[in-house]
Amino acid sequence: MAEEHGGLDWLRGRSVLVAGAGVSGRATIEPLRDLGALVTVTDANVDALAECARLGAATVPIDDLLAERDRVAEFALVVTSPGFRPDAPLLSLAAGDGVPIWGDIEFSWHVDRAGLYGPPRRWLVVTGTNGKTTTTSMLQSILEAAELPSLACGNIGIPVLDALRQTEPRAEALAVELSSFQLHWAPSVRPTAGAILNIAEDHLDWHGGMQPYIDAKARALTGEVAVLGLDDEVASSLFSSSPAVRTVGFRLGVPAPGELGVEDGYLVDRAFADGERLAPAEGITPPGPAGLMDALAAAALARAIGVPPDAVAAGLAAHVVGPHRAALVAEVGGVTFVDDSKATNPHAARPSILAHERVVWIAGGLLKGARVDDLVREVASRLAGAVLLGRDAMQIAESLARHAPEVPVVTVETGDDAGVSAVPQTATHRVVLPADTDSDAVMGVVVREAAALATAGDSVVLAPAAASLDMFASYGHRGDSFTDAVGRLDASDISRTLR
């Protein structure tokens, strides 16, 4: 089969190492085998390796592979999952031995260009610090309304390789959500259109700094049409240096020529048309400025491949917000509880908090090198209280002490976290739980403490500004845990006097 696909025929009979036995790693196995490659998968998780073995791959625990350093040089290619940092020992060893390293998205691109599963698709790439999933799902809804065979894939839906292999029905366009991790390992990708929604501090521990993070995001702009959020300082700064054939901006205000924007209550296109109305701004979900920005980006990508205005309107009208994205959970005792667990960095938490007049903020987790001072300064006037949990809770507490000292703060701590001695003076109350308290029980305490700080008319908002993996399996697990805990409240839990 590989002789028919000249771009990858060099892999026939060659040994390829897949780094990571998760979803993206498993999706790599079958295409590599279709190309005639000899596939070995490595991971620390023996159960995941067993699943890969059932798919026909050889497997080796990563510690065993690292112990046999010379063995890595025997591979013709390493295809890495996005979870591996550039300085991971395995990848450093491969690079030192001169072994090419591709991410799963890079491999997907080459597979598609080589025609392994039919003529190449049109890739519509979405990236940004926040709003990627919402924008991609909006885009997919628009493509469906246009009756264009398409699939949402990448960080949303299914791996890109699985989308390429799906032939019944065959997707002609792919709505591809990509993270900075995936783009870092995908230097060859040239999308039909690619969008950067916004860029703020996130994943700096993985990238090693802000500029490498920006550089990774900018790889979405290397195709035919680049789409940039002009209301975002960092994203808009990339406009003049965009290597795309055509660069289009979008903004919340009235659009200039070459832009999409909002005018007289409508999303308006002055990039691919002369001021054509695309859809009413009212009714976009999720509501608010962030939702409108996502809708404009999705519309721009769709318009870049000729989707008509009526399909944009129909797709946005049909769009349903995914879970854990500013979702209303319940109202208890006059207090509204909102799950925005998807707000995994300070930039994402900001609009979630500012959407409400008075907020008891639930925050904490893994900050991933991001700073919260700017966020706290901006939202301080809205805060009726804060309840903090997770590994980096004290960093948020310290920021509250500096910029919102009048805001009552509760810290819910377990294990080693309870031994932190430098508790900021704003901490009105500390709750110290046994080290073996499970995450759902911790969230139950957090929600009760938040209810205690709230009064009728307030909103308790889970907008953690941090990743979840220090305590929860995912942001979805964290949001579900919050929802379950809210379900156990009654009106008597609201506005208790702090102990």
Swiss-Prot record:
GO terms for biological process: cell division; cell wall organization; peptidoglycan biosynthetic process; regulation of cell shape. Cell wall formation. Catalyzes the addition of glutamate to the nucleotide precursor UDP-N-acetylmuramoyl-L-alanine (UMA). GO terms for cellular component: cytoplasm. InterPro entries: AlaDH/PNT_NAD(H)-bd (IPR007698), Mur-like_cat_sf (IPR036565), Mur_ligase_C_dom_sf (IPR036615), Mur_ligase_cen (IPR013221), MurD (IPR005762). It catalyses: UDP-N-acetyl-alpha-D-muramoyl-L-alanine + D-glutamate + ATP = UDP-N-acetyl-alpha-D-muramoyl-L-alanyl-D-glutamate + ADP + phosphate + H(+). It is an enzyme of class 6 (ligase). The lineage of its organism: Bacteria, Bacillati, Actinomycetota, Actinomycetes, Mycobacteriales. It is found in: Cytoplasm. ATP binds at residues 128-134. Disulfide bonds: none annotated. It comes from Rhodococcus jostii (strain RHA1). It comes from the Bacteria. Keywords: ATP-binding, Cell cycle, Cell division, Cell shape, Cell wall biogenesis/degradation, Cytoplasm, Ligase, Nucleotide-binding, Peptidoglycan synthesis. Pathway: Cell wall biogenesis; peptidoglycan biosynthesis. Signal peptide: none annotated. Its EC number is 6.3.2.9. Pfam families: AlaDh_PNT_C, Mur_ligase_M. Belongs to the MurCDEF family. This is UDP-N-acetylmuramoylalanine--D-glutamate ligase.
